Amino acid sequence: MSVAAGGPAGAAIPESRLMALGILGGLAGIYASAVNPVIGPVLASLGAVCAIVWGADAIRRVASYGLGTGVPSIGYMSVSIGIVGVVAGLASVFVVPAIAVPVVALILAMILGVVVAVLGKKIVKMKIPILEKCTAEISGAAALSVLGFSAAIAGSYTLQTMLTSVITTGFIGLLFILNTMAIQHPFNACLGPNENQTRTLKLAASTGFISMAIVGLLGIGLNPSWWLVSLIGALCWIVAFRAFVSASFEEAASVKWSGLWPKEEEH
């Protein structure tokens, strides 16, 4: 059972593989952002989607220890931690090589996530055995997804381009909301006794890709490939969302599009 204070249901995909997908895919996309002005932002966005899927799985694992009411809370908290890690990572360019900035942002976000989780267990008395691990994962996923989408908008992950294209414009605030919803919504929508990882992650892919389509629009006037980012994001969203809906139909006892459910004696 996925939401009965007993932890998540069985996983079809090991968490280690999803972590590898999020970290390696996210970092690869960020580093590729400046390779080419056309394909770079697309790769950065795809890397961000990889991180979102990783974060959604971590949300699924930690939020299964309860009724699911804390899903939005840990989502917003962890993405805010991730953004702090991103900003600190960008500022670290004054003490570390520029190529290390994404890794520093990831590490700082995950460390801060662990600190906040420890405070939650010690002060708030949250009795979740995997709180530290999952909060660190969600914060790291948030950092990579925000940095990936920011690089897609700005065209690179350098401090100056981020300040000019993402922070000064206020897009960083929009990315906070956008990435939070993309990471926390999948489990929030699928939680329940019959929740399973595969269906939840299909929805996570769809929220990641629709976010990618929106990020492309934010790049209008900032990078020449904004339309390609939006187009690929929208097409992939259609594929992912259809897969999610199909999985929901297959696993549902029955489907009713409108009106009230029939009474038992009317079946």
UniProtKB/Swiss-Prot annotation:
InterPro entries in the record: THM_MeTrfase_su_C
Q: Where does the protein principally reside?
A: membrane
Q: GO cellular component terms?
A: methyltransferase complex; plasma membrane
What membrane topology is annotated for this entry?
Multi-pass membrane protein
Keyword field: Cell membrane, Membrane, Methanogenesis, Methyltransferase, One-carbon metabolism, Transferase, Translocase, Transmembrane, Transmembrane helix
Q: Where are the transmembrane segments?
A: 18-38, 39-59, 76-96, 99-119, 138-158, 163-183, 209-229, 230-250
- Specify the domain of life of the species encoding this protein: Archaea
Q: Where does this one sit in the cell?
A: Cell membrane
Q: In which pathway does it act?
A: One-carbon metabolism; methanogenesis from CO(2); methyl-coenzyme M from 5,10-methylene-5,6,7,8-tetrahydromethanopterin: step 2/2
Please give the record's induction comment. Part of the probable mtrEDCBAFGH operon.
Q: Please tell me which top-level EC class this enzyme sits in.
A: translocase
The EC code for this enzyme is: 7.2.1.4
Molecular function terms in GO for this entry? tetrahydromethanopterin S-methyltransferase activity
Reaction(s) catalysed by this chain, per the record, are: 5-methyl-5,6,7,8-tetrahydromethanopterin + coenzyme M + 2 Na(+)(in) = 5,6,7,8-tetrahydromethanopterin + methyl-coenzyme M + 2 Na(+)(out)
Q: In Gene Ontology terms, what is a biological process of this protein?
A: methanogenesis, from carbon dioxide
Could you say which protein family the record assigns here? Belongs to the MtrC family.
Role summary:
Part of a complex that catalyzes the formation of methyl-coenzyme M and tetrahydromethanopterin from coenzyme M and methyl-tetrahydromethanopterin. This is an energy-conserving, sodium-ion translocating step.
Subunit notes for this chain? The complex is composed of 8 subunits; MtrA, MtrB, MtrC, MtrD, MtrE, MtrF, MtrG and MtrH.
Protein name as catalogued: Tetrahydromethanopterin S-methyltransferase subunit C
Source species of the chain: Methanothermobacter marburgensis (strain ATCC BAA-927 / DSM 2133 / JCM 14651 / NBRC 100331 / OCM 82 / Marburg) (Methanobacterium thermoautotrophicum)
